[in-house]
Amino acid sequence: GGDLLRQGIATSMGAESLQIPLFGLFGACSTSGEALALAAMCVAAGYGERMLAVTSSHFGTAEKEFRFPLSYANQRPLSAQWTVTGSGAFLVGNKKSNVKITGLTIGKIVD
């Protein structure tokens, strides 16, 4: 799971009571895809029957950490993108289903 807060605090606090292993991810817009890919690879490798891929974000936090704090009162152009305040989750498992992950693409750095 992952989020946009420093140290992945929202994910860590949300998962604490579950008492299950956790990969803490921090990839901004890519966190959902990273979590889904990691969950699919873990299930395919037999590390678990079910994996939960979770991500969350918060507009105010994203502004504070990646752009300008809201208290700075920076003017935003009408075309500016806005970070959603929300969360999403996928349950990835090894049971037969019509919904399948058949492949994924992981990037690499080329200089």
Kindly label every feature range from the protein language model.
Residues 1-30:
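Conserved beta-ketoacyl condensing-enzyme motif
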Residues 9-12, 62-67:
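Short acidic, glycine/serine/threonine-rich loops at helix termini
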Residues 2-7, 57-58, 97:
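Short glycine-enriched loops at secondary-structure junctions
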Residues 2, 51-57, 92:
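Short beta-strand segments
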Residues 1-2, 24, 53, 101-103:
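General beta-strand structural signal in soluble alpha/beta enzymes
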Residues 48, 62, 70-73:
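Membrane-interface helix-loop-helix junctions at boundaries between adjacent transmembrane segments
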Residues 68-111:
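Condensing-enzyme catalytic core mediating Claisen C-C bond formation in acyl metabolism
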Residues 26-51, 92:
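Active-site-proximal alpha-helical scaffold in enzymes
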